[in-house]
Amino acid sequence: MRLLLIAVALASALGAGRAGAAEFRSAGESAVILYDAPSVKARKLYIVNHGYPLEVMVQVEGWIKVRDATGTLAWAESRMLNPARTVLVRAAAVNIRQKPADDAPSVAEVRRDVLLGVVEPAAGGWIQVRHRDGATGYLRAADVWGD
């Protein structure tokens, strides 16, 4: 019986798919200060600019522990974070494509650390994004961080 329960739990965890995917938020309307503890009296570590994607690790009253694109863990005031999704380009340079296919025409080229808005979350290995200049298209999800 115990082995059956373990097998069921393991199958459930493996089948979670997108439901178990990481949760992300973005830095709100202004720059967000990241702290080493959940308090404004804690040591200030650094600041992230508007729109920067942050992975949610833990939420406690008024605070969210986040991970940035470099893997650094810090605390942010939850009121300073926005549910709007953004991603950072990780590849040296990639083309935003008209359709989710490697042979689709390019709409724009973007370089590492460019911030893009998420139009549609990743599906089939591609994510639909929007550049601040208005260009909209698809990138491979592996080429960005934040989804």
Predicted regions and their residues:
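Bacterial N-terminal signal peptides
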Residues: L5-G15
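SH3-family beta-barrel domains
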Residues: R18-D36, K44-Y52, M57-P100, P105-A135, ...
